[in-house]
Amino acid sequence: MSDLKETWNRHASDVIANNLAGLMGDFTPAGMAKAMALGSNPLSATSFEIIDLGNNEVEITYVGNARRTIWSKWEQVGDKWQIADLAERP
């Protein structure tokens, strides 16, 4: 099983690289629905910052021309971590 913090770093890197194939396995069905809602305003970033909030929750701030922060709650599904809930933070 992947370490959760390693998974967060890989996930954020995949977001920046627009690696959709890598991202697809990162979401539970409920998490995917919320990600699709955020997808109407795509991210454009060159770097990211991660804040571990504890309890399998994280805020990832994507930095580009602007900054966007996405909160997510991760859960272990089988042998991998997936996003069960997410929201954009101001």
Give the role of each language-model region.
Residues 2-57:
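Short solvent-exposed beta->alpha transition segments
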